[in-house]
Amino acid sequence: MPTINQLIANPRVVQKSRKKVPALQQSPQKRGVCTRVYTTTPKKPNSALRKVAKVRLTNGFEVIGYIPGEGHNLQEHSVVMIRGGRVKDLPGVRYHILRGVLDTQGVKNRKQRRSKYGAKRPK
């Protein structure tokens, strides 16, 4: 416990809380260019090949974004939109790539939760 004199000499400093999505810089989304599209494996106890992309954002940040849904058309130099939201079983993946926006196509044959995957309404 500090004395009054110690507190006068150097007052208490409020700790700043760590941001969960620093690369967005308070924006809801950011645009970027894919520098590498690849698959990676999740933490234990899960097993899969998760599709991810390394993205260079317009503000200079380089982040890893998860590509949701079945199948995708992304490759190097694809222009994508990114949103916040981590993937719990992929360490270091703190962003999601938006489907159906810019160069990313929506998921084919998607009937439910279509808006989340950029799928058009079936006829």
Swiss-Prot record:
Domain of life of the source: Bacteria
Supply the Gene3D superfamilies for this chain: Nucleic acid-binding proteins (2.40.50.140)
GO CC annotation terms, alphabetical:
small ribosomal subunit
Q: Which residues carry this modification: 3-methylthioaspartic acid?
A: D89
Any keyword NAD? no
Q: Tell me one Pfam family matched here.
A: Ribosom_S12_S23
Modifications the protein undergoes after translation, according to the UniProt entry:
Both N-terminus methionine truncation and retention have been observed for this protein.
Supply one GO BP term. translation
Identify its protein family. Belongs to the universal ribosomal protein uS12 family.
PANTHER family listed in its UniProt record: 30S RIBOSOMAL PROTEIN S12 FAMILY MEMBER (PTHR11652)
Q: What is this protein called?
A: Small ribosomal subunit protein uS12
Gene it is expressed from? rpsL
